[in-house]
Structure formats: C-alpha cells, structure tokens
C-alpha cells in the first residue's frame, strides 16, 4: 500500500522532553507498567509512552487538538513499523507478565494506528529503533525455561489464556523451537475460547471509548467552527452599524438647520410655472408610453395572425393527406358496391319470385274455388227448377275442390273453438293455409336465399359494408372540414352509397307480416339517425343539411320496395296483411315525409299503387250472388251459406279499405269504399235479404267501419252524399220492422242514423211513427 507523503509538524520547545521520554524503554523485562487512566491526556501535553497518548487522545474536547493528534499519530506510526517486520513471531510469543505487557502494548499501538489519519512514515522510521526492542534468543530461552519450571509445579495455574493469533504463527513457533513443544500426552485440547485477561478487556473498552470520543470531538469541532463563523458575522454587522451611526451623527451635525439664514419670499407664479412645466413633461411621457403600448398591441396582433397563418400552412399537408385518403376510400367503396350490386339484385329477385309465387297460389286458389263453388250452386239451382227427381252429377275436379274447401273450413272452425273465438263470421277468414309439403318447400327455398344474403359481404371489411363505419368516415369529414363537406353535397350522395347495403338488410323484410321488424328497429335506421343527430351545421345550411338523409333514403330505397309489395304481393282481403302494411306506411309517409313544398314521386307512386290494388280487389274478388228467396230462406241451404260468406267477405274488404283513413284522402276512400263497394255490392245483397235481426246486425257492421272523422262536425244534419242509398235502406227496413214486433231493431236503426249524422231523416221517421220515446236519442247526440 502506498504511503502518504511526509508531513511536518510544528512542535513546542517544551515538548522535546516528551519526545525524549518516548525513546526510553523499560529497564527490566519483568518490571510492571502502570496503565494510563483514560482522560489524563486532557490536562497534559503528550509525554511518556505512545500508549498513554493514544488512550488519552479521544477524551480531549477542548484544548490543543492539533498537537495531540501529531503526537498520537507519530507514536502509532513508530510502533507499527517493528510490528510489521516481526510479523507472527511477536504475536505468538508466550512470555511472562512483563513480556506480555510489551507484546500487548505493541498490539494496542497497532490498533491505534487506524484512528489517526495524520501519521507520517518518515517520523515512524526515525523512532522505530528507540521505542521497541526485539528480544534476543537468550531472553526467549530464559522465558521458556521459566515457564516450563512453573508448569512442573503441581499448584501452578497459568493465567495466560491468550490465544495465538493464527495457525501459521503456531507453525512457525514450532519450527523455530521444536524442543519446547510438549509431548502428545501433555497437549490440551481447547474446547472453548480462552478467556481474555483483564488488561485485554480494559484495552478493548478504552478503544471503544476512544472511538466514541473521536466522533464527539468531530461534532464538537464542527460546532466550534459554526459558532466562530456566527460570531464573526455578528461582530462585522455591529461594526457596520457603528460606522453608519457615526456617519449619521456627523451628517446630522452638518445639515443642521440654521435659523439665521434668510430666504427670498415665495412667488406663487414661479411655483405654478414649475408645476405646469412638470405636468407637461409628465403628459408627454404618458403620451409616449401610450404610443409604445399601442405599438406593442399591434405587434401582438400581427404575431398572432402570423402564427395562425403558419399553423394553417403547416396543416395543408395534413389536409391534403386527409382528402387523398378520403378519395381513395370512396373509390374503393364504390368499386366494392358495384361489384356486389349484381349479386344483391339476383338475391332480391329470387326472394321476390318466391313470395310472388306464394301470393299467386293463394289468389288463384281462391278464384278457382269461388268459380267452382258458384258453378256448382248454379247447377244445383237449375236442377231444382227443372226437375226434382233426376240425378245430379258433379265432375271429379269440382268434387275434389269442394271437399278441399270444406276440409280447410273445418280445421279453421276447430281452431277458433280452441281459441275461444265464437263470434266469428263465415267468410272473414284469410284462406292462406298451405299444404305441409308446399310449406316445407317454401321454407327450404327461403332458407337458401337467406344463406346467400349472409355471404354477400362475408369477405368484405367492415369499413366497406358496415353502415355505421361508413357514416363515421363522412362524419369525420364534416367535423374537420365542414365547408368542403357541404360544397361536395355529401348529403345527396350518402343515400345512393347506402342503397345497396340497405337493400341487403331488406331482403328478409316482409311488411305484410305482423311479426316483421319495424323500420325504426333496423340497424341501418339507427345508424342514420345517429349521423343526423351529430350534425353541427348552422342555420344558413339548413336547406342542404344532413337532416334530409333519412327522408332521401326512404324515398329512394324503402318506398320503391314497399310499392313492389303493394302491387304484386298484397292481398287487400287479408286483414293481417293490410294492418301490417298500414303500420309501415304510416311510419314512412307521416313521420319521415319530405318537405311540404317538395313533391315526392316515389310517395305518389306508392299511394297510386295502393288505390289501384284495392280497385282491382273490388272488381275481381267481390262476388255476392243473388238467389231466389225460396233458396235463401233456409239458412242451412248451400245457397244461403255461400251468399252469407260472400257478403261478409265483401264487408271485410270494405273494412280494410277504410283502414287507410288518414293515409289516403277522404274523397278517394269515399269513392272507393262507399261508391264502388257499398252501393254496388253490399246494399244490393241487403235489399235481397229478409228484414230482421240479421239485416240490422249487418247494417251495424257497415256503420262501424265508417271513420268517425267524417262525422265530427256537430252542425251536420244530413250525412255525406255517398251514404244516401244506405240511409234509404235503413229507413225502409225500419218501416217494415215497426209494423212487426222488432222494436229493439228499430231503435238500433235510429242509432245508426244518428251516428252517420242523418238527423233529419231520423226525426222524420220518429214523428211519422209517433216514436216519441226515441227523441231522446237525437237530443243526446
């Protein structure tokens, strides 16, 4: 290990005797040495042995610490040198008490060497020979003999329990003196650690105290340094204050007011002039500051505008990137839709053909059954008129059709009995049952078409087939660049882009079924509504806003499909189909109609199709035959049953037509329902019937179908012109029934007249037949 450079120390002249004393060695090996008391070095300069100096050094708190360290470190360094040379020999010597003191003294000085950082190697070399004397061979031999003689005595107990420092030292000792090693039987096996001597314990305690004292001394040194610094600062501040006070006293003496001096009289004009001059200067300064402030404000504004220009110029690259990505996206979307539109049209055609085939099957079957049954009854009537004894033969086809008709009617009666519907009238049922084999084929074909529907966009990413994702793209465009968005008329393009995607979702949609999904519950409808609700356009762009997107989609996609259902698939005689169709049409035509000033061609086409289809149903499907009274008086005769069924079937169509109240105009409904159906077919059948409770019941059903909206005007005394024939029939029936005992039926007829606002006719009838008790019915109305 490298030695520190040599250091020089100043020593007092009085310490020379101490250094001389340090060179002295004990006169005799066995002479006892007195252990120094810890803390004695506090009062004395370093003198005597280095051991006393080392023990007393840490206990000094005040006094000349520097010189104490010099002596202690020099002594330690001096005594450390011979111990390093002698090595293990000095550590393994087993001598008498005096030699043990010397060896112990040497070990303590070696331990104290680590406590001082100021030792000098040069000084230790000078004092090496004077402080420690190495015992010679004669001295060692004499000590060994003395120890052996002491061991030979029986009552001798050795107090030397000091352990050898190391195994290597013992080996070297045995090698140096093999004769001194005891025999095997004289060796003692150490089972525990040998106890320390009193001197060793005292030395260890002194070392620990020295370490603690050294730490305390370092803290005391820091505390002393800090106190001195604070005192120097305080003295310096006090001196400065004294200097200031002295200067202040001197200046006060100089500036002392002398009352003997006289001043010229005060002139107010001069003071005023000075104040005005000062005010002018301040105003000019203020104006200059204002000019500078305005200049700074202009600079700030120009800086802000420059920043905005720079930011906008830096965003041009991002804007270009966005427009480019949007252009690529729209092109890819159009290419995808153009590729899929052919497949979509094929699937739509397949589904439409399947439903059309089913509808035509029902219609053709109804017409064929009506034709065969009517022919059979006519033949039966001719037979009854010509002869009563001849045999009547029916061809096999007619017989099979009649049996099939009766079989289906029987099943429907049983179903109504099970459901508890006992008020059903024959002829009002929808004869739309299919044989099981045909139903299985229909369901299989429909399932195959729906599987093809699912595979249309199976391999396409959601960004190009999901309506919500597509609208989100355009919504981002609208939020980032609204000007370019509205300039591109995107609200007019979106319905065309979404048309194929919506048509795919409408393949399984059948508005003629009551269980069909409503438009508001469809995914595309909700997505479009969310897109419209998120619109942030201002009032200036309201005319071209995205709020018309849904109406445009309905006009371009939904209404044309609905028109196809009305023209080719809708059966006006079916109440369930009519009710479901009206529900969807109300949503389309009322809640999402276009602007009042704008005429929708698709909407007009739909309404025309509805009216045209109902006219066709009135002309083709309504057939009420007229038979002789002798044939229909018997309610169980086939003629009477057939006539009843056909009347109720016509009344069912009458009711279905008037369900369009609110969607079709009143003139259209009155012309179609009252003019062509009621007056042309139903009234004739009623006139051919015998007056009685059945006729009154039928009249009640006719009046119940009429919309209340037509009779809301309380000032009406006469009904609408199209009901004139019906009113005359009611009065005629009332005249006939009043002559008999059907007074309750007469009262019901009066109520019907009051309901349809034929009040004048009702009052005339009551006055003519002196039915004063029925006048209250008119007054209550």
Curated annotation (Swiss-Prot):
Query: Where is there biased composition of kind Acidic residues?
Result: 17-26, 213-222
Q: Name one GO molecular function term.
A: DNA binding
Instruction: List the biased-composition ranges (Low complexity).
Output: 114-123
Going by the UniProt record, its keywords in alphabetical order are: Coiled coil, mRNA processing, mRNA splicing, Nucleus, Phosphoprotein
GO CC annotations on file: cytosol; nucleolus; nucleoplasm; nucleus; U2-type post-mRNA release spliceosomal complex
Per its UniProt entry, which superkingdom is the organism in?
Answer: Eukaryota
Q: Where is the composition biased (Basic residues)?
A: 1-10, 59-68
Q: Where in the cell is it found?
A: Nucleus, Nucleoplasm; Nucleus, Nucleolus
Where composition is biased (Basic and acidic residues), the residues are 82-92, 101-113, 201-212
Q: Does the keyword Amino-acid biosynthesis apply?
A: no
Q: At what positions is Phosphothreonine found?
A: 97, 213
Which GO biological process annotations does it have? mRNA splicing, via spliceosome; spliceosomal complex assembly
Query: Which InterPro entries does the entry mention?
Result: GCFC2-like, GCFC_dom
User: What residues bear Phosphoserine in this entry?
Assistant: 16-17, 19, 40, 96, 129, 174, 180, 214, 217
Q: In which tissues is it expressed?
A: Widely expressed in tissues and cell lines.
Query: Region Disordered: what ranges?
Result: 1-228
Q: Where are the coiled-coil regions?
A: 267-312
For this chain, the family text in UniProt reads: Belongs to the GCF family.
The UniProt function text for this chain reads: Involved in pre-mRNA splicing through regulating spliceosome C complex formation. May play a role during late-stage splicing events and turnover of excised introns.
Note the subunit structure.
Answer: Found in the Intron Large (IL) complex, a post-mRNA release spliceosomal complex containing the excised intron, U2, U5 and U6 snRNPs, and splicing factors. Interacts with TFIP11 and DHX15.
What is the name of the protein in this document? Intron Large complex component GCFC2
- Gene giving rise to this polypeptide: GCFC2
């Amino acid at each position: 290990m490298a030695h520190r450079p040599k250091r020089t120390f100043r020593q007092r002249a009085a310490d020379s005797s101490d250094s001389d004393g340090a060179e002295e060695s004990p006169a005799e090996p066995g002479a006892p040495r007195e252990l120094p008391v810890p803390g004695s070095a506090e009062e004395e300069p370093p003198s005597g042995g280095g051991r006393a100096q080392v023990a007393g050094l840490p206990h000094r708190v005040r006094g000349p610490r520097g010189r104490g360290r010099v002596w202690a470190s020099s002594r330690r360094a001096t005594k450390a040198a011979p111990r390093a040379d002698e090595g293990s020999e000095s550590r393994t010597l087993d001598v008498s008490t005096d030699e043990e003191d010397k060896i112990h003294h040497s070990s303590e000085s070696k331990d104290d060497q680590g406590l001082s950082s100021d030792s000098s190697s040069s000084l230790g070399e000078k004092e090496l020979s004077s402080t420690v004397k190495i015992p010679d061979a004669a001295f060692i031999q004499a000590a060994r003999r003395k120890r052996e003689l002491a061991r030979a005595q029986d009552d001798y107990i050795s107090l030397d329990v000091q352990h050898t420092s190391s195994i290597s030292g013992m080996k070297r000792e045995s090698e140096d003196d093999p004769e001194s090693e005891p025999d095997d039987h004289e060796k003692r096996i150490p089972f525990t650690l040998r106890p320390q001597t009193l001197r060793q314990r005292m030395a260890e305690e002194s070392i620990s105290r020295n370490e603690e004292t050294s730490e305390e001394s370092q803290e005391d040194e820091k505390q002393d340094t800090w106190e001195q610094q604070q005192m120097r600062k305080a003295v310096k501040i006090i001196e400065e204050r004294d200097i200031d006070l002295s200067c202040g006293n001197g200046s006060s003496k100089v500036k002392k007011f002398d009352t003997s001096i006289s001043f010229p009289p005060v002139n107010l004009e001069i003071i005023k002039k000075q104040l005005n001059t000062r005010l002018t200067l301040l105003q000019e300064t203020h104006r200059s500051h204002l000019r500078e402030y305005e200049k700074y404000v202009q600079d700030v504004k120009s800086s802000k505008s420059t920043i905005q220009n720079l930011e906008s110029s830096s965003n041009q690259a991002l804007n270009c990137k966005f427009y480019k990505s949007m252009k690529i996206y729209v092109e890819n979307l159009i290419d995808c839709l153009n590729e899929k539109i052919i497949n979509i049209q094929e699937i739509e055609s397949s589904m439409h053909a399947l439903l059309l085939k089913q509808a035509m099957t029902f219609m053709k079957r109804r017409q064929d059954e009506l034709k065969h049954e009517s022919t059979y009854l006519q033949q039966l009537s001719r037979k009854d008129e010509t002869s009563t004894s001849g045999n009547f033969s029916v061809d096999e086809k007619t017989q099979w059709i009649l049996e099939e008709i009766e079989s289906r009617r029987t099943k429907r009666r049983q179903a109504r009995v099970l459901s508890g519907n006992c008020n059903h009238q024959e002829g009002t049922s929808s004869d739309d049952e299919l044989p099981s084999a045909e139903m299985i084929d229909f369901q299989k074909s429909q399932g195959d078409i729906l599987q093809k529907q699912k595979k249309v966009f199976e391999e396409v990413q959601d960004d190009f087939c999901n309506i919500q994702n597509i609208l989100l793209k355009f919504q981002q465009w609208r939020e980032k660049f609204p000007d370019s968005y509205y300039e591109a008329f995107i609200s007019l393009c979106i319905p065309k882009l979404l048309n194929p995607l919506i048509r795919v979702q409408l393949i399984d949609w059948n508005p003629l079924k009551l269980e069909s999904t409503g438009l508001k519950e469809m995914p595309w409808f909700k997505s479009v509504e969310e897109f419209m609700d998120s619109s942030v356009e201002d009032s200036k762009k309201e005319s071209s806003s995205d709020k018309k997107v849904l109406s445009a989609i309905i006009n371009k996609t939904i209404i044309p499909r609905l028109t196809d259902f009305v023209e080719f698939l809708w059966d006006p005689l079916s109440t369930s189909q009519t009710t479901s169709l009206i529900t969807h049409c109300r949503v389309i035509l009322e809640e999402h109609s276009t602007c009042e000033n704008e005429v929708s061609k698709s909407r007009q086409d739909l309404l025309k199709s509805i009216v045209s289809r109902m006219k066709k149903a009135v002309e083709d499907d309504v057939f009420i035959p007229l038979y002789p009274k002798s044939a229909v008086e018997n309610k169980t005769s086939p003629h009477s049953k057939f006539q009843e069924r056909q009347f109720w079937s016509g009344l069912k169509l009458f009711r279905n037509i008037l369900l369009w109240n609110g969607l079709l105009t009143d003139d259209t409904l009155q012309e179609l329902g009252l003019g062509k159906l009621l007056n042309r077919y139903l009234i004739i059948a009623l006139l051919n019937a015998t007056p009685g409770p059945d006729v009154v019941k039928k009249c009640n059903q006719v009046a119940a179908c009429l919309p209340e909206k037509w009779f809301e005007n309380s000032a009406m005394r006469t009904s609408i012109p199209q009901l004139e024939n019906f009113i005359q029939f009611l009065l005629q029936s009332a005249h006939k029934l009043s002559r008999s005992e059907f007074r309750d039926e007469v009262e019901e007829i009066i109520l019907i007249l009051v309901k349809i606002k034929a009040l004048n006719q009702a009052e005339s009838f009551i006055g003519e037949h002196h039915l004063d008790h029925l006048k209250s019915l008119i007054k209550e109305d």
